[in-house]
Amino acid sequence: MTLSDFIGALKDNPYFGAGFGLVGVGTALAVARKGAQVGMIFFRRHYMITLEVPSKDKSYHWLLSWITKHAKHTQHLSVETSYMQHESGKVHTQFDFHPSPGNHIIWYGRKWIRVERVREKQMMDLHTGTPWESVTFTALGRDRQTFFNILQEARELALKQEEGRTVMYTAMGAEWRPFGFPRRRRPLSSVVLESGVAERIVDDVKEFIGNPKWYTDRGIPYRRGYLLYGPPGCGKSSFITALAGELGYSICLMSLSDRSLSDDRLNHLLSVAPQQSIILLEDVDAAFVSRELLPTENPLAYQGMGRLTFSGLLNALDGVASSEARIVFMTTNFIERLDPALVRPGRVDLKQYVGHCSHWQLTQMFRRFYPQESAAEADHFSEQALAAHTDLSAAQVQGHFMLYKTDPAGAIKNIAEIKD
């Protein structure tokens, strides 16, 4: 049989024709599928825009709230429960619903936007125990302005929720995270210090904030340190909280006695503190004591703890690598226990004693709690209080007034009970 006869026989064979047809169809489908994939990749790269936001980014929680507001009709939700316990013991619980992990479609700016929330089950934040997440926005077109508008709107929504409130931050790992609910701003007038003390500190802070160019022109590091010292309960921390409210600043709380705090971590945290915030280091005497004291004079409660060294703290406050545009407040009950190197100018630029209540302070506090009473009654209360006790703290006086909220006469009559 010749070759031409063999080929002719194959053409006449129905089984061979059917098989060849199937191979052809399969090949065509495979080519079409690959072409569709390549075409989709080309289309997504050139005619679609994507924005990915990881959970560690500061805007992540802003965007979750924004998605919740715009994806009102989604039926796939996750809940975030928060509660706050009042001093009376009553617990207020709040449930916040967010779109669950998965795909959601949102109509925004006259276009459809696909929102994909992904939760990584294999990875989690070691400090909070929460899984790592990300949110990806996908939209048609090549205009980035849509995503800028979304981020700006999410930011404004978050700031509106914090408007008129003081946000507290605490150090979690290598970053600052909000601590609890934003608090209502405390009026500066609600903290009564000795005459002229509050004004001196407020004027100094405002002068520092308003003159960054003065520091730059003279080559002076743009940072400011304050030390408030005095007996406990006299209003040091309360004044700092009220000052933050007056300035519209947040507060970053840091404990130097934290065993996980190292030199590098402290330096990093001070460098990445939120803008327009006050860094508060409370009771610095509890972490470090003066090197001039004898070892026998150092109780265990005041020995250095953790991995943070004294030199590391000094370098973080004003070393070569220390950050600028920073306001640091330190408080202590025992200034004599602090090392002179810690409180020298450059690390502490202004030291202020906040002591027991004077006659003027007692008068002002009485008039604030009982505005309907005369100045003579307020003066009489102050004289009686100082005659009974010469070392009254603001916390003790306020606690006494709380027992006689509507009874100023009782507050004066029972002044002897103020320390009981």
Curated annotation (Swiss-Prot):
- GO cellular component terms, A-Z: mitochondrial inner membrane
List GO molecular-function terms, semicolon-separated. Answer: ATP binding; ATP hydrolysis activity
Q: Has UniProt tagged this entry with the keyword Transport?
A: no
Q: Does the keyword Glycoprotein apply?
A: no
Instruction: Note the superkingdom of the native organism.
Output: Eukaryota
Q: Outline which residue ranges sit on the Mitochondrial intermembrane face.
A: 1-15
Which InterPro entries is this protein grouped with? AAA+_ATPase, ATPase_AAA_core, ATPase_AAA_CS, BCS1_N, Mitochondrial_chaperone_BCS1, P-loop_NTPase
Mitochondrial matrix membrane side = 33-420
Record's keyword terms, sorted: ATP-binding, Chaperone, Hydrolase, Membrane, Mitochondrion, Mitochondrion inner membrane, Nucleotide-binding, Transmembrane, Transmembrane helix
Q: Which Gene3D superfamilies match?
A: P-loop containing nucleotide triphosphate hydrolases
Q: What processes does the entry annotate via GO biological process terms?
A: anatomical structure morphogenesis; mitochondrial respiratory chain complex III assembly; protein insertion into mitochondrial inner membrane from matrix
Q: Which reaction does it catalyse?
A: ATP + H2O = ADP + phosphate + H(+)
Q: Which family does it belong to?
A: Belongs to the AAA ATPase family. BCS1 subfamily.
Q: What does this protein do?
A: Chaperone necessary for the incorporation of Rieske iron-sulfur protein uqcrfs1 into the mitochondrial respiratory chain complex III.
Q: What is this protein called?
A: Mitochondrial chaperone BCS1
Gene encoding this chain? bcs1l
